[in-house]
């Protein structure tokens, strides 16, 4: 299991939203690069970054902040938000992003995902953000008529590296991961699935390490880390112990 610390970018700052609402943003760090370095120093080994402004604008809007982070950390970084065409995919990968996350375009333009995954094996993930079971797009401002499983099935044989599945109703509210829905998705497709939205405490990490969640690649932690509800040292020690034991 990988525990991904999250950095969400809005106006060049590190923020957390509640249920994806840009009007309910809390600024946690004015310097995203410093936050990234802090996560690296704490021992995390994969960073999750979202360009929130980009998700709404449909193009990268926080490139300067992302590039500053890439200069100060050596760990892999996955990035989502505003990645809607092959040119943007290629540009980010060339700048040092390990894996791009395609969200809205996965619903609107599935051929982009297939083309990108073929061109850049192992470096293209799909972000599926669900509200009441249906996938939301355009920075979660619109809800489509398709389910996360419908979308995931489209990419079953496309070479997609991972699916990041977010329960919008829980995101930023510290209500706990929606493991039942995430595991159901993970069991239904062969693509590795990452849980996102609501991780609240060490109990969520423990739940991720149980046999029923074994197929999941990992989970994303946001507000719980910023609020101090999740101790990075404790969480990472549990994960490393589980890895040694073969979990």
From Swiss-Prot:
Subcellular location: Cytoplasm
Organismal lineage: Bacteria, Pseudomonadati, Pseudomonadota, Alphaproteobacteria, Hyphomicrobiales
NCBIfam families attached to this UniProt entry: 1-(5-phosphoribosyl)-5-[(5-phosphoribosylamino)methylideneamino]imidazole-4-carboxamide isomerase, PRK13585.1
Gene Ontology biological-process annotations: L-histidine biosynthetic process; L-tryptophan biosynthetic process
Official protein name in the record: 1-(5-phosphoribosyl)-5-[(5-phosphoribosylamino)methylideneamino] imidazole-4-carboxamide isomerase
Biological or metabolic pathway of the protein: Amino-acid biosynthesis; L-histidine biosynthesis; L-histidine from 5-phospho-alpha-D-ribose 1-diphosphate: step 4/9
Enzyme Commission designation: 5.3.1.16
Keywords (A to Z) from UniProt: Amino-acid biosynthesis, Cytoplasm, Histidine biosynthesis, Isomerase
Keyword Amino-acid biosynthesis: yes
Reaction catalysis annotation: 1-(5-phospho-beta-D-ribosyl)-5-[(5-phospho-beta-D-ribosylamino)methylideneamino]imidazole-4-carboxamide = 5-[(5-phospho-1-deoxy-D-ribulos-1-ylimino)methylamino]-1-(5-phospho-beta-D-ribosyl)imidazole-4-carboxamide
Organism: Bradyrhizobium sp. (strain BTAi1 / ATCC BAA-1182)
List of catalytic residues: 8 (proton acceptor), 129 (proton donor)
Xref: HAMAP family: HisA (MF_01014)
EC class (word): isomerase
């Amino acid at each position: 299991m990988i525990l991904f610390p999250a950095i969400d970018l809005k106006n060049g700052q590190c923020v957390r939203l509640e249920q994806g609402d840009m009007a309910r943003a809390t600024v946690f760090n004015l310097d995203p690069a410093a936050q990234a370095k802090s996560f690296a120093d704490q021992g995390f080994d994969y960073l999750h970054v979202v360009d929130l402004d980009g998700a709404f604008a449909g193009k990268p809007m926080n490139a300067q902040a992302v590039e500053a982070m890439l200069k100060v950390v050596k760990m892999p970084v996955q990035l989502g938000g505003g990645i809607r065409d092959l040119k943007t995919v290629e540009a980010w990968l060339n700048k040092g992003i390990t894996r791009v996350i395609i969200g809205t375009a996965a619903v609107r333009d599935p051929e982009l995902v297939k083309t990108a995954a073929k061109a850049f094996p192992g470096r293209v993930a799909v972000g599926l953000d669900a509200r009441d079971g249906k996938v939301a797009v355009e920075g979660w401002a619109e809800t489509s008529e398709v389910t996360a499983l419908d979308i995931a099935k489209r990419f079953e044989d496309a070479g997609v590296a991972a699916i990041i599945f977010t329960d919008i109703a829980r995101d930023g509210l510290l209500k706990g991961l929606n493991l039942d829905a995430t595991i159901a998705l993970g069991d239904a497709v062969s693509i590795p699935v990452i849980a996102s939205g609501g991780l609240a405490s060490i109990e969520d990490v423990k739940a991720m390490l149980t046999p029923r969640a074994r197929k999941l690649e990992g989970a994303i932690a946001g507000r719980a880390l910023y609020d101090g509800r999740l101790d990075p040292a404790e969480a990472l020690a549990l994960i490393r112990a589980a890895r040694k034991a073969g979990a």
